[in-house]
């Protein structure tokens, strides 16, 4: 690594050094309490998968260049130079962490390893060593926001074709069961690309008599996955600007954990509220705006709490409220939602597909064991494993196949739509 590259990377590092970040970097006592809290370490007990080790990869560079002792005494506190070897270590640290923050729940000092790992991801971007796939997906999202008028006709053609599928689930008096560009709508729904994220949601909104409109943009924020703050902001602002232009009162995010957390926590103070679709479904049930076949699902049902929606987003009671309405045999797994095991698919790992599949399956053994231990399901039970996150759904499907669990992995929103009654 040449000096100009190193200097550029250290400038990026320095830009992340808020007071909170400095506390995280300087507080660790090496107590090790966080170590067994990580799903990767619990599944594969190797030191390099401990949260403290991941943080230490970043911390040693911090000591070398941002602490007087490290500059004067190069060997102090295992201070380490930022070089090509360090970049490889940063890459492993960054992309074996899903950002689930389970370790933070156990840390006596509340050190946020995910925030420390965000430095690693930013340095990788600066060095051109980040996963190319994630950067490409983030760039495509940014480009879509800059050329929305060009994609509108094709998007609307696709939406009109989906409307017949919505009507198969719930009859609508509206000319368009999937409304778009409705200024003054109460709700802007931000979906993912694909019928599975649009059709069930539209059926439930129409059943509730909602005044809603569909966003032109998909919810997922690939800028957040790759750890690029500028692209994260650009992708987020597409939706914020659309919501402001349409003067909606609420932005509802589909079953996508990172999309929900980014919109909820990073959009700043806005004239609209932000909700997950799970919160909206629970609200409809409490207000009597929709009716479901109560206890109509007789198969055993287990629920996986997505980390970004539950532990990092606070949505824990609503999915259980819905499931206890839907299911005759709902089985709670332990530990409780704040301490639930991560599925192992977050942080961009699922988006990397086959590239990360082997690691994802090995690191998710603790999740598979948790499901078996508390679900108490036999393959012949045809039990349902429900979740409210696209990444989790994909990862849990992979886990189900890899560990031969014999489960039927479903989206919670689809279960609600399937159970609608007049």
Model-predicted regions and their roles:
Residues 191, 278, 305-307:
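Short, structured patches in soluble enzyme cores that scaffold and shape functional sites
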Residues 36-64, 105-124, 348-364, 394-405:
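Iron-sulfur (Fe-S) cluster-binding segments and ferredoxin-like electron-carrier domains
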Residues 28-34, 38, 97-103, 107, ...:
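Short cysteine clusters
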Residues 284-327:
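C-terminal amphipathic alpha-helical segment
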Residues 5-8, 27-30, 39-93, 312-320, ...:
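Hydrophobic scaffolds flanking metal-cofactor catalytic centers in soluble metalloenzymes
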Residues 110, 191-273, 310-323, 331-422:
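Cofactor-cradling patches in redox/metallo enzymes
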Residues 15-25, 55, 59-262:
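Iron-sulfur-cluster electron-transfer modules
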Residues 14-32, 83-102, 245, 330-340, ...:
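Immediate flanking context of iron-sulfur cluster ligation sites
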């Amino acid at each position: 690594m040449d000096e100009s590259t190193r200097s550029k990377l250290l400038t990026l590092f320095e830009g992340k050094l808020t007071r909170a970040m400095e506390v995280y970097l300087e507080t660790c006592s090496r107590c090790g309490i966080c170590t067994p809290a990580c799903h990767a370490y619990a599944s594969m007990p190797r030191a390099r998968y401990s949260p403290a080790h991941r943080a230490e990869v970043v911390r040693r560079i911090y000591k070398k260049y941002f602490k007087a002792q490290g500059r004067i005494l190069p060997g102090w506190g295992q201070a380490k130079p930022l070089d090509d070897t360090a970049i490889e270590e940063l890459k492993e640290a960054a992309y074996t962490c899903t950002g689930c923050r389970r370790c933070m729940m156990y840390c006596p000092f509340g050190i946020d390893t995910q925030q420390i790992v965000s430095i690693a991801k930013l340095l990788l971007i600066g060095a051109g060593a980040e996963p190319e796939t994630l950067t490409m997906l983030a760039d495509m999202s940014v480009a879509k926001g800059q050329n929305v008028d060009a994609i509108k006709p094709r998007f609307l053609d696709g939406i009109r074709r989906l409307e017949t599928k919505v009507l198969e689930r719930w009859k609508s008096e509206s000319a368009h069961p999937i409304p778009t560009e409705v200024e003054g709508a109460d709700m802007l729904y931000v979906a993912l690309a694909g019928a599975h994220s649009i059709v069930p949601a539209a059926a439930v909104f129409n059943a509730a008599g909602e005044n809603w409109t569909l966003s032109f943009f998909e919810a997922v924020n690939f800028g957040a996955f790759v750890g690029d703050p500028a692209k994260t902001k650009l992708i987020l602002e597409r939706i914020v600007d659309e919501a402001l232009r349409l003067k909606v009162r609420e932005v509802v995010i589909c079953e996508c954990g990172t999309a929900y957390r980014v919109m909820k926590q990073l959009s700043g103070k806005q004239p609209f509220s932000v909700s997950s679709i799970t919160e909206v479904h629970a609200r409809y049930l409490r207000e009597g705006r929709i009716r479901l076949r109560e206890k109509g699902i007789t198969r055993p049902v287990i629920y996986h709490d997505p980390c970004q929606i539950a532990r990092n987003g606070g949505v824990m009671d609503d999915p259980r409220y819905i499931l206890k309405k839907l299911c005759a045999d709902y089985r709670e797994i332990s530990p409780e939602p704040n301490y639930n095991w991560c599925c192992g698919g977050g942080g961009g790992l699922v988006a990397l597909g086959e590239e990360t599949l082997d690691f994802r399956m090995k690191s998710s053994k603790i999740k598979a064991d948790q499901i078996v231990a508390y679900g108490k399901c036999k393959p012949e039970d045809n039990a349902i494993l429900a979740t409210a996150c696209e990444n989790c759904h994909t990862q849990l499907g992979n886990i189900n196949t890899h560990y031969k669990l014999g489960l039927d992995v479903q989206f919670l929103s689809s279960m609600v739509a399937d159970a609608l009654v007049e």
